[in-house]
Amino acid sequence: MKILFVAAEGAPFSKTGGLGDVIGALPKSLVKAGHEVAVILPYYDMVEAKFGNQIEDVLHFEVSVGWRRQYCGIKKTVLNGVTFYFIDNQYYFFRGHVYGDFDDGERFAFFQLAAIEAMERIDFIPDLLHVHDYHTAMIPFLLKEKYCWIQAYEDIETVLTIHNLEFQGQFSEGMLGDLFGVGLERYADGTLRWNNCLNWMKAGILYANRVSTVSPSYAHEIMTSQFGCNLDQILKMESGKVSGIVNGIDADLYNPQTDALLDYHFNQEDLSGKAKNKAKLQERVGLPVRADVPLVGIVSRLTRQKGFDVVVESLHHILQEDVQIVLLGTGDPAFEGAFSWFAQIYPDKLSANITFDVKLAQEIYAACDLFLMPSRFEPCGLSQMMAMRYGTLPLVHEVGGLRDTVRAFNPIEGSGTGFSFDNLSPYWLNWTFQTALDLYRNHPDIWRNLQKQAMESDFSWDTACKSYLDLYHSLVN
């Protein structure tokens, strides 16, 4: 099968979050499974700076963006068997960052038009075209409404993956003519209109042959008013083509037996290296080096969406326990300030590292006993899977991908891979925290069994790849 991915970011070239991880990992797994895979990404200035000497020029042409003719260069490199093509236009993509400009609508309108017109020119007409989030969600619409006259594109099947429904691409309807060069008919009849705006995500949901999300629970949640971001009715209407597939993690990169960022390696049969990493981490972040105290890790953006309003409200109570917490992350200044204040009040119990450090993050995943992740909503989440890979038990709010990946501790059977609570409130966070602390202190054999189950969980991309192939084969024989 010939599969083409079109996305706004992709590791290792450009990455701001989970979308970049997916584009870096899933195509590689599909190639291993015997498929021909290509990816189209914008050619950002950070790609030029880091990978420019590895990328070759292929061709260039002009793209009509409304009444304008814009330069479009095509560049190319091959990595892990995947051919990466880059859309080059320095005006649109040399901004020092991926997102956040006032003209993001124009930037990604150009990108989508260029990606479609590039397919013939690079001689890669896919059987299946996989687009991601709102930045590329107009492509299924454009294929059916603007480029339907191109015979080579007639049989292309499309899949839209929603990584985060909050970001929908809502713009003025004038963009249809001014940028995409199409009429207003589909806006006037309501197909593309939502809240009196042009909504790119709605267009993708309606025009793609299949819609996927990054976990089965999130696929269900976005059809409810609580999580649907005002598109729940549209998703319910199209529910027959909506499914959820849990993202994977790179099992080779996140491997406690070989991780180059760790001082000591270990496996599920011998956790002595984990204990040494714990002592090393305690020393590094300025906490008393104690093997007996439960060490809780947090690696996250400090935002309300991640549940840190509830954590801050609970923190004074939690820190009355004989416990240590090491936090790494940045975000809302109010939360940054709160954690910094608590770290001053409880210097032997809380280390607040208001920054981001890849090595420290990896040490937290590997060295801690518990990993706190009480997200208000979480489409998939990768941190809980990374933590489990290293025998660090997650304590999570049961939403989205957290519900699908963390098996809550069952005291009757002594089974599970972590701890969870259903109601995001200080009471239930504290109650679940106490359950975990009691198990850690009084039932070490059960705790050790949970660690083993967590480390044996299969979150590899090869497993996720099989689910995506089942989805693709439902469209392409």
Swiss-Prot record:
InterPro entries (alphabetical): Glyco_trans_1, GS/SS, Starch_synth_cat_dom
GO BP annotations listed: glycogen biosynthetic process
Record's keyword annotation contains Lipid biosynthesis: no
UniProt entry keywords in alphabetical sequence: Glycogen biosynthesis, Glycosyltransferase, Transferase
Assigned EC number: 2.4.1.21
Amino-acid positions noted as binding ADP-alpha-D-glucose in the UniProt annotation, renumbered to this chain: 15
Record bears the keyword Lyase: no
Recorded metabolic or biological pathway in which this protein acts: Glycan biosynthesis; glycogen biosynthesis
Pfam families membership: Glyco_transf_5, Glycos_transf_1
Alphabetical list of Gene3D superfamilies matching this protein: Glycogen Phosphorylase B
Molecular function (Gene Ontology), one example: alpha-1,4-glucan glucosyltransferase (UDP-glucose donor) activity
Swiss-Prot/TrEMBL catalytic activity: [(1->4)-alpha-D-glucosyl](n) + ADP-alpha-D-glucose = [(1->4)-alpha-D-glucosyl](n+1) + ADP + H(+)
Family per similarity comment: Belongs to the glycosyltransferase 1 family. Bacterial/plant glycogen synthase subfamily.
Summary of the function given for this chain in its UniProt record: Synthesizes alpha-1,4-glucan chains using ADP-glucose.
HAMAP family for this protein: Glycogen_synth (MF_00484)
Protein name (record): Glycogen synthase
Record organism: Streptococcus pneumoniae (strain JJA)
